[in-house]
UniProtKB/Swiss-Prot annotation:
Domain of life of the native organism: Bacteria
Cellular component aspect of the GO annotation: DNA-directed RNA polymerase complex
Record-given protein name: DNA-directed RNA polymerase subunit beta
Record's catalysed reaction(s): RNA(n) + a ribonucleoside 5'-triphosphate = RNA(n+1) + diphosphate
Recorded GO MF terms: DNA binding; DNA-directed RNA polymerase activity; ribonucleoside binding
Species classification: Bacteria, Bacillati, Actinomycetota, Actinomycetes, Bifidobacteriales
Length: 1187
C-alpha cells in the first residue's frame, strides 16, 4: 500500500508540473492603468491585527520589534500594552508605605475553545490571562510571589474580529484630539482685539490653559477654574522673581507683568492660587502645594502619554525623553514664550530638534488637522479599559492591606479580579465602539474593520459636532477617505482609512510618498504624518515620467503647505504620491471611472456596495479597478494555502494539500452558515485535485467572491431608455430572464430560538402533544416535538412544540380524584410553541438542541432556569421581485417597478434582449457619468477587442493603450484604476475595434449606441440607444422584509390604539395630515369611522367585528379611548373636566354595558388575539394588550 501511495503522489506532482497553472495568486484582469505603484497596498486588516498584537505582546509583534531595532527605525512601540499597564500600576502600596504589590510578566494560556466552537455554542473566544504578582512586607522584608489568574481575556480572531457570546464583533478605531499643547486665536467679545491662548491637554489629568488677555497680561486657568496671573503660577511652581526675569529676559510683555506683581514668595503665591481654585477652603501653602502637585506633577494622576510628550517636543522645540510623561517647568516656560511670540506676531521661535538648534514656525493650531487628531486603535481602547479596571482593583488591594493580617497576606488574597473583568465585559458588550460586525458581504466586513469614528467615549457627540469637524480637510489626503462617510447625522464623523494609510506608534495616520532627488523620482518610499506634509513640496502620482523616472515636463502641479495646488519647477519637488488611489478608501477605489462621478453620488455608490447581498452564483465585474483582488483576499472570506504544495483531495467542505515540506494541511470550508446580516455564508473550492499551489494561493472562494476577485453583483445588458413611463423617477424595468435563471437570487438564513424554562407553576415542556392543535399542524414535527430538517414551512407553522403550565384555581373533588389517579399529566397547560413569524417562509436547514444534561457533559453553559434550548435555522430562496432595490456602483439606485416577459424587452439586431432598462434622465442632473463610461467599457470587455482592426495604424489613441491590452478575447475582465483609468479617446477607439459577432456584425457603434427593436412590435426604435454591460448589485433592502399587512392585532395598553411597525404586527398610522386630507374632501363619515371604530373605540370595534360576521348593519361608534386619556391628563393638571348630560348633571363616561370584555364574551371570540400571540408574550412592546 505504501508503494502505491508513493507512486500516486509522484504522479500527482508530475501532473502538476506538466502544465503551467494559474496559481491563483494574482488578478488576471487586463489593466488599462498607466502608473506603476512602487509598493503594495498594506495589509487591509493591519489596523486591527497590528494593534491587538501590540496589546498582548504576540510573537508577530516581537518579530516586528526585532526588525525595527535592526533597521534603527521607530515604526513599532517597543513595550507591549499589557506590560505598560501593569508597570504603571506597580507597585501598589498601602497608606503607610510598609507593604507593596508588584505585577510583572503577563502571559496567556491556550484558548479553551476554537473560534468555530465559540460561534456554535455562544461562547466568548478568550484565553486565561496570568500575571506574576509579588508581595513585599517592608517591615519584615519578606517577599511572597505567586502567579495570579486575572480572568478570561477576549482574543482577536486572525481576521481582526472578536467572538463575544457567539456573535462576531468589531472594535472600531476612534479619532480623538491628541494630547499635547495647542495655541489658538479668538476675538475678544468686548473689544475687537485678538486674544491668544494656549492649552496643555494631557491624556489623563487636569488641563492647564494660558492666555494673553486684551490688556496684554499673561493669565493662567488651572483645571478650567477662574483666571489668574501667570506670574503667580510660575512663582507657585517654585520659580523666584529673579529666575522668571532671567528666563523671560527677551520677552518685555512678561517682564511688565512681573514688575506689577505684588506677591514676593512661593508661599504667598500658593495661598493666592489656592484661594481662587478652592474659595470655600482655608488657604495654606501646604494645601496649595499638594493641590498643584496632584494636578500636574503626580504621575498617577497626570499623564501626557508618549504621544503628548512627542507633540510638546515637536511644537515647543524641547528635548525631553518620550517616556517622560509628566509636565515640567521647562514645558510651562516654553509654552508661555511661544504664546508671547504668537501674540507679538513673530514668524519663528527658537527651539531644538534632534539635538540641533532650529527655528520653529509660529502659528495657531488647526484642531481639525490630522497632525492634531490621532487614532485610538483596538489595542489602546482595550488597554484604557484595563487601566480603569486595574485602578478599581487597586483601591480594593489597598483596603485589604490595611484590614488583613500582615503575616497571612498573599498576593492571591489581596487581588479581586472582578472589577477588571466587569470593565472589559462592559466594553465589549455595550461600548459605542464595539459593533456588531457587518457581514453582509466581504467588502462590508473589511470596511467595518477600517472604519474611523469620531464618536464614542472621549470623542465628539453628533449633536455638538460643528461643520468644521465634519468637513473634508487637506490633511485627510492619503489618510482618511474624502468620499466614504454615512449620509445621515453622522456624516463626516465616521470615515474610512485610506487605501495606503497606516497608523504609527503614536496613533497618527501616515501615508507613503516616493522620494524625489533633483527631479528624479526614486522607488524609495517614506511614510509621513500630516504635520510633516506641510514642510515639503509634493507632486501628484499622475505626473508624467520617462522610463528613467525623470519628470517629462519642466514644471509639476504640487501641494505646497496648506495652499491650493500650484505649478512649481520640478527641481523643487521633494516627494511624489505613490498611487492615484492613495487618496480614497478601499470601497471608493472599487468604483470604476470614479473620477467622472460627482462627490455625493460617489459617496452613495461606495456605501451601497456594502449593502450588496451575496447571490447564489457570484460573478466578478467585467469592468473593475484592480482593487477587487486585494479586497477579497484580505477580507478573510477566502481560504488561502499556508505552504507550497499539491492538492490531494477536494470536496465541497474539505481541501487537503500535501505540502512540499512533507506535512499535510487540511482546510475546512464553511457551508451555508448564517451571517450576522442573515445572508448565506458559503465557501466553494476553486482548485482541482492534483493542482500545484503556492503559499498564499486562493483555494476556495467565499460569499460574493469569484476566482479570488470580489464579486458583489452581476454583469447585465443595460439599455438607457424610457419605457411607457415604467422607469420614471429611478424605477427599473427588468427582464423575466433574471427571475427564471436565478441571476439575482439570494439565500437568506433566519435563526429562531426557544427555550424551556422552570416556571413557578412547574417546568415548561418541549413536546408534540399540544392542546387544541390538530394532527396536520404537527405533521412535520418529530416525536420530540421539533421540526424535521428539510420541511417547507410558512407563516404560523409550528417549529417547536412547547407547553407551559397554567395558573391553577381551587380544584373540585372530581379534579382532585383525576389528579390522584393520573398524576401530574392532567394539569392544565397552554400552547406556547415556537411558530414561524408573520410573513416568513422557507426550508428548515438545521436544528440545534442543547439540554441541561448535554451542557453539563460538554461543559456548556445554559442560562439559569433554562432546561433546554432549541434553535431552528430556516433558509429562504429569494428571487428578485417588484419592490426590490437595485443599484450600480455610481450611486445610481432604483426600485424594480416591472418585470417584463423576455419577449417584450427591447432587443439588439441579433435578437439578444436587454436585461434592464434604466431611465436616461437619471444621468445628467446627477452628474455620475461614470455609469455611462462603464456601460461602454463593459460592452468592449464583453465583446473582446483588437486594436489592429482600426485601419489607421498611426491613430493617436493607440499610443495610449498600455502594452498587453492591444487585444483580448470576449468576456475578458478589465481594470480601469481610479484617477488612472481608460482615457475617453481610448474608449472611443476600442468601441470601433470590438470583435464582431458570429454574423460578422458590430451591434454597438463607435458612439456606444445601438439600434434596438421593440420586443412587442418588432419595429426598430427611431433613435440609437446606449447599450452595454453594467455591473448591477442587489441591495439588502428587500421587499419581502418590508411588506406588511395587519387585520387585527395588538393594541397599546394606554391609548388602546394599534401598535406601529412590522415587528409589533402594527397598523398603518392615520396621522394628522391624513385627517386633514379627509377633512378637505368633507368625508365626514369616513373620518369618524377612522378615528373611532377603526382605531380606539374599544367596545365599538368589537361590535363592528360581530356585525360584519353576522351580516348586520354597523352599530354607531362609541367614545375613543384616547379622548378618555386626554380627559385624565387634563384632570392630572388639576383642571376639573366633567361630562354633563342633557340635564346638565355630571355623569361618568363609562356606562354599565360599555364593557368590551362582556361584549367579547357575548360574541364568543376575541378580535385582538393572534395565533402566534402566545409565542410573542415575552415581547412587551409598549405593553400591548390583546383586546
Amino acid at each position: 500500500m505504501a508503494t502505491e501511495s508513493t507512486t500516486n503522489t509522484t504522479t500527482i506532482i508530475a501532473r502538476a508540473d506538466q502544465h503551467d497553472i494559474d496559481l491563483h495568486k494574482a488578478s488576471d484582469r487586463v489593466n488599462f492603468g498607466s502608473i506603476k505603484e512602487p509598493i503594495d497596498v498594506p495589509y487591509l486588516l493591519g489596523v486591527q491585527t497590528d494593534s491587538f498584537d501590540w496589546l498582548i505582546g504576540s510573537d508577530r509583534w516581537k518579530a516586528r520589534v526585532e526588525e525595527d531595532e535592526k533597521n534603527g527605525t521607530n515604526t513599532v512601540a517597543h513595550t507591549s500594552g499589557l506590560d505598560e499597564v501593569f508597570n504603571e500600576i506597580s507597585p501598589i502600596e498601602n497608606f503607610a508605605q510598609t507593604m507593596s504589590l508588584t505585577f510583572s510578566d503577563p502571559y496567556f494560556e491556550e484558548p479553551r475553545h476554537t473560534v468555530q466552537e465559540c460561534k456554535e455554542k455562544d461562547y466568548t473566544y478568550s484565553a486565561p490571562l496570568y500575571v506574576n504578582a509579588e508581595f513585599e512586607n517592608g517591615d519584615t522584608g519578606e517577599i511572597k510571589s505567586q502567579t495570579v489568574f486575572m480572568g478570561d481575556f477576549p482574543l482577536q480572531t486572525p481576521h481582526g474580529t472578536f467572538i463575544i457570546g457567539g456573535t462576531e464583533r468589531v472594535i472600531v478605531s476612534q479619532l480623538v484630539r491628541s494630547p499635547g499643547v495647542y495655541f489658538d486665536r479668538q476675538q475678544d467679545r468686548t473689544s475687537d482685539k485678538e486674544v491668544f491662548g494656549a492649552k496643555i491637554i494631557p491624556s489623563r489629568g487636569a488641563w492647564l490653559e494660558f492666555e494673553i488677555d486684551k490688556k496684554d497680561q499673561p493669565q493662567v486657568r488651572v483645571d478650567r477654574k477662574r483666571k489668574q496671573s501667570a506670574i503667580v503660577f510660575l512663582m507657585a511652581i517654585g520659580m523666584t522673581k529673579s529666575e522668571i526675569a532671567q528666563a523671560f529676559k527677551d520677552y518685555p510683555l512678561v517682564l511688565d507683568a512681573l514688575e506689577k506683581e505684588t506677591l514676593e514668595t512661593q508661599d504667598e503665591a500658593l495661598v493666592d492660587l489656592y484661594r481662587k481654585i478652592r474659595p470655600a477652603d482655608t488657604p495654606t501653602p501646604e494645601a496649595g502645594k499638594n493641590l498643584l502637585d496632584s494636578f500636574y506633577f503626580n504621575t498617577k494622576r497626570y499623564d501626557l502619554a508618549r504621544v503628548g510628550r512627542y507633540k510638546i517636543n515637536r511644537k515647543l522645540g524641547v528635548e525631553a525623553d518620550f517616556n517622560d510623561r509628566s509636565l515640567h517647568q521647562e514645558d510651562i516656560i516654553a509654552t508661555i514664550k511661544y504664546l508671547v511670540a504668537l501674540h507679538d506676531g513673530a514668524a519663528t521661535f527658537p527651539g531644538k530638534r534632534n539635538g540641533e538648534d532650529v527655528d520653529l514656525r509660529v502659528d495657531v493650531d488647526d484642531i481639525d488637522h490630522f497632525g492634531n487628531r490621532r487614532i485610538r486603535q483596538v489595542g489602546e481602547l482595550i488597554q484604557n479599559q484595563l487601566r480603569t479596571g486595574l485602578s478599581r482593583m487597586e483601591r480594593v488591594v489597598r483596603e485589604r492591606m490595611t484590614t488583613q493580617d500582615a503575616e497571612a497576606i498573599t498576593p492571591q488574597s489581596l487581588i479581586n479580579i472582578r472589577p477588571v473583568n466587569a470593565t472589559i465585559k462592559e466594553f465589549f458588550g455595550t461600548s459605542q465602539l464595539s459593533q456588531f460586525m457587518d457581514q453582509n458581504n466581504p467588502l462590508s466586513g473589511v470596511t467595518n474593520k477600517r472604519r474611523l469614528s469620531a464618536l464614542g467615549p472621549g470623542g465628539l457627540s453628533r449633536d455638538r459636532a460643528s461643520m468644521e469637524v465634519r468637513d473634508v480637510h487637506p490633511s485627510h489626503f492619503g489618510r482618511m477617505c474624502p468620499i466614504e462617510s454615512p449620509e445621515g447625522p453622522n456624516i463626516g464623523l465616521i470615515g474610512s482609512l485610506a487605501t495606503f494609510g497606516r497608523v504609527n506608534p503614536f496613533g497618527f495616520i501616515e501615508t507613503p510618498y516616493r522620494k524625489v532627488v533633483n527631479g528624479h523620482v526614486t522607488d524609495e518610499v517614506e511614510y509621513m504624518t500630516a504635520d510633516r506634509d506641510l514642510d515639503h513640496v509634493i507632486a501628484q502620482a499622475n505626473q508624467e515620467l520617462d522610463e528613467n523616472g525623470n519628470f517629462v515636463s519642466k514644471s509639476a502641479l504640487a501641494r505646497v503647505g496648506e495652499e491650493e495646488a500650484v505649478d512649481v519647477p520640478v527641481s523643487s519637488v521633494d516627494y511624489m504620491d505613490v498611487s492615484p488611489r492613495q487618496m480614497v478608501s478601499l470601497g471608493a477605489s472599487l468604483i470604476p471611472f470614479l473620477e467622472h462621478d460627482e462627490g455625493h453620488r460617489a459617496l452613495m455608490g461606495t456605501n451601497m456596495q456594502r449593502q450588496a447581498v451575496p447571490l447564489i452564483e457570484s460573478e466578478r465585474p467585467l469592468v473593475g479597478t484592480g482593487s477587487e483582488w486585494r479586497a477579497a483576499n484580505d477580507s478573510g472570506d477566502v481560504i488561502k494555502s499556508e505552504k507550497d504544495g499539491v492538492v490531494t483531495y477536494v470536496s465541497a467542505d474539505l481541501i487537503r494539500v500535501m505540502n512540499d515540506d512533507g506535512t499535510t494541511s487540511s482546510y475546512k470550508l464553511a457551508k451555508f452558515q448564517r451571517s450576522n446580516q442573515t445572508t448565506c455564508y458559503n465557501q466553494r473550492p476553486i482548485i482541482h485535485d492534483g493542482e500545484r499551489v503556492e503559499a498564499g494561493s486562493v483555494l476556495a472562494d467565499g460569499p460574493a467572491i469569484q476566482k479570488g476577485d470580489l464579486a458583489l453583483g452581476k454583469n447585465l445588458l443595460i439599455a438607457f431608455m424610457p419605457w411607457n413611463g415604467y422607469n420614471y423617477e429611478d424605477a427599473v424595468i427588468i427582464s423575466q430572464r433574471l427571475v427564471q435563471d436565478d441571476t439575482l437570487s439570494s439565500i437568506h438564513i433566519e435563526e429562531y430560538e426557544i427555550d424551556a424554562r422552570e416556571t413557578k407553576l412547574g417546568a415548561e415542556e418541549i413536546t408534540r402533544d399540544l392542546p387544541n392543535v390538530g394532527e396536520d399542524a404537527v405533521a412535520n414535527l418529530d416525536e420530540r416535538g421539533i421540526i424535521r430538517i428539510g420541511a417547507e414551512v410558512e407563516a404560523g407553522d409550528i417549529l417547536v412544540g412547547k407547553v407551559t403550565p397554567k395558573g391553577e384555581t381551587e380544584l373540585t373533588p372530581e379534579e382532585r380524584l383525576l389528579r390522584a389517579i393520573f398524576g401530574e399529566k392532567s394539569r392544565e397547560v397552554r400552547d406556547t410553541s415556537l411558530r414561524v413569524p408573520h410573513g416568513e417562509t422557507g426550508t428548515v436547514i438545521g436544528v440545534k438542541e442543547i439540554t441541561r444534561e448535554d451542557a453539563e457533559e460538554d461543559g456548556d453553559e445554559l442560562p439559569n432556569g433554562v432546561n433546554q434550548m432549541i434553535r431552528v435555522y430556516i433558509a429562504q430562496h429569494r428571487k428578485i421581485t417588484v419592490g426590490d432595490k437595485l443599484s450600480g456602483r455610481h450611486g445610481n439606485k432604483g426600485c424594480i417597478s416591472r418585470i417584463l416577459p423576455e419577449e417584450d424587452m427591447p432587443f439588439l439586431a441579433d435578437g439578444t434582449p436587454v436585461d434592464i432598462m434604466l431611465n436616461p434622465l437619471g444621468v445628467p442632473s446627477r452628474m455620475n457619468l461614470g455609469q455611462v463610461l462603464e456601460l461602454h467599457l463593459g460592452w468592449i470587455a464583453h465583446s473582446g477587442w483588437d486594436i489592429s482592426l482600426d485601419p489607421n495604424m498611426e491613430a493617436e489613441w493607440k499610443k495610449l493603450v498600455p502594452s498587453g491590452a492591444e487585444k483580448a478575447e470576449p468576456n475578458t475582465p478589465v481594470a480601469t484604476p481610479v484617477f488612472d483609468g481608460v482615457k475617453p479617446e481610448v474608449l472611443k477607439g476600442l468601441l470601433s475595434t470590438t470583435l464582431p459577432n458570429r454574423d460578422g456584425d458590430r451591434l454597438v457603434g463607435p458612439d456606444g449606441k445601438a439600434t434596438l427593436f421593440d420586443g412587442r412590435t418588432g419595429e426598430p426604435y427611431t433613435k440609437p440607444i446606449s447599450v452595454g454591460y453594467m455591473y448591477m448589485l442587489k441591495l439588502h433592502h428587500l421587499v419581502d422584509d418590508k411588506i406588511h399587512a395587519r387585520s387585527t392585532g395588538p393594541y397599546s395598553m394606554i391609548t388602546q390604539q394599534p401598535l406601529g411597525g412590522k415587528a409589533q404586527f402594527g397598523g398603518q398610522r392615520f396621522g394628522e395630515m391624513e385627517v386633514w386630507a379627509l377633512e378637505a374632501y368633507g368625508a365626514a363619515y369616513t373620518l369618524h369611522e377612522m378615528m373611532t371604530t377603526k382605531s380606539d373605540d374599544v367596545d365599538g370595534r368589537v361590535r363592528v367585528y360581530g356585525a360584519i360576521v353576522k351580516g348586520d348593519n354597523l352599530p354607531p361608534a362609541g367614545i375613543p379611548e384616547s379622548f378618555k386619556v386626554l380627559l385624565k391628563e387634563m384632570q392630572s393638571l388639576s383642571l376639573n373636566v366633567e361630562v354633563l348630560n342633557a340635564e346638565g348633571v355630571a355623569i361618568d363616561m363609562k356606562d354599565e354595558d360599555d364593557d368590551p370584555a362582556s361584549s367579547a364574551d357575548d360574541l364568543g371570540f376575541n378580535i385582538g388575539a393572534r395565533p402566534d400571540a402566545a409565542a410573542k408574550e415575552d415581547q412587551k412592546a409598549e405593553e400591548p394588550e390583546y383586546q
